[in-house]
């Protein structure tokens, strides 16, 4: 018996197939969110809905189709004697999270109230339904869509908060989820604060000469030797680090063109830890 967990992001949709008997993740897959063709960020997609009659239906069907394709990829990646269609029959639960705009579009809810202050949620509570109600080819699965918090702080931040227990600590704890839309949660057992801000353009190319989206060939991990200052890195689409013999073969067909958001954050941290820049970000 399997379950599926999916983070429906503005740029990337990430999914995990879980053995419900053991709790083990047995397959994972990711895909670009095809809604990008309607708008690179959340507000441009909301604008598309406002300016195009039926635009919300287009965006809803697009993300649901992408989600069903991702589930197919998970079934294909599972190491089992079952055929992919048979694996679908053994999936009994699916949990979906995402920012409020993606949450509303996935559920077929008008996102336009989120397009201007006070950024009102039409539905913020958890939603339970049959997976088939979301046009997913999972005939025996129940679907749980996580609760949104408020404004543009969504179910993805709520699930991360529960996992990290930011809301249940004695000492203040800060949880940061940096995607196309960044969400920050600061909390203790007594009180929790949450906020969000668009960050995608800053980490995916805008004003960064070597910035790019998290696609095949993007540098995603960076380490700097604290003694020699020699860097090494990993790219999306290859398992080996740049200083390992297998790297050249694994990246032969990849166009290594820049750094995605995770690499930009890591290189700043590595520069600081190596003493190559100070706490103000000034390179020594």
Label the model's feature ranges.
Residues 1-5, 10, 22, 59-88, ...:
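Nucleotide/phosphate-binding catalytic cleft detector across ATP-hydrolyzing
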Residues 2, 12, 16, 280-284:
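Non-catalytic terminal/interface segments that mediate subunit docking, oligomerization
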Residues 10, 15-17, 23-43, 113-126, ...:
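Glycine-rich phosphate-binding loop of actin/hexokinase-like ATP-binding domains
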Residues 41-56, 136-145, 248:
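Gly-rich Lys/Arg/Thr-decorated short loops/hinges at beta-loop-alpha junctions or inter-strand turns
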Residues 53-75, 79, 92, 239-265, ...:
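N-terminal leader/propeptide and maturation segments of large enzyme subunits in energy/redox metabolism
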């Amino acid at each position: 018996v399997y379950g599926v967990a999916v983070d429906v992001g503005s740029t990337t949709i990430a999914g995990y197939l879980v053995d419900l008997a053991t709790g083990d993740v047995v397959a994972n897959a990711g895909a670009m969110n095809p809604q990008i063709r309607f708008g690179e960020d959340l507000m441009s997609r909301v604008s598309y809905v406002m300016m195009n009659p039926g635009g919300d239906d287009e965006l809803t069907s697009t993300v649901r189709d992408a989600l069903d394709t991702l589930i197919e990829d998970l079934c294909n990646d599972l190491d089992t004697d079952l055929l992919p269609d048979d694996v679908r029959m053994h999936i009994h639960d699916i949990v979906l999270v995402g920012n409020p705009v993606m949450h509303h579009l996935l559920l077929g809810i008008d996102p336009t109230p989120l397009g201007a202050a006070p950024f009102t949620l039409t539905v913020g509570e958890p939603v339970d339904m049959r997976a088939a109600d979301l046009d997913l080819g999972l005939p025996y699965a129940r679907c749980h869509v996580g609760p949104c918090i408020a404004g543009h702080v969504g179910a993805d931040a709520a699930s991360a908060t529960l996992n990290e227990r930011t809301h249940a600590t004695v000492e203040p704890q800060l949880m940061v989820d940096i995607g196309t839309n960044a969400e920050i949660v600061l909390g203790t057992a007594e009180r929790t604060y949450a906020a969000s801000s668009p960050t995608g353009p800053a980490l995916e190319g805008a004003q960064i000469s070597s910035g790019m989206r998290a696609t095949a060939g993007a540098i995603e991990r960076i380490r700097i030797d604290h003694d020699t200052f020699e860097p090494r890195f990993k790219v999306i689409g290859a398992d080996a680090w740049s200083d390992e013999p297998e790297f050249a073969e694994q990246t032969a067909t990849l166009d290594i063109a820049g750094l995605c958001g995770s690499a930009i954050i890591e290189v700043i941290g590595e520069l600081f830890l190596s003493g190559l820049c100070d706490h103000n970000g000034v390179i020594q």
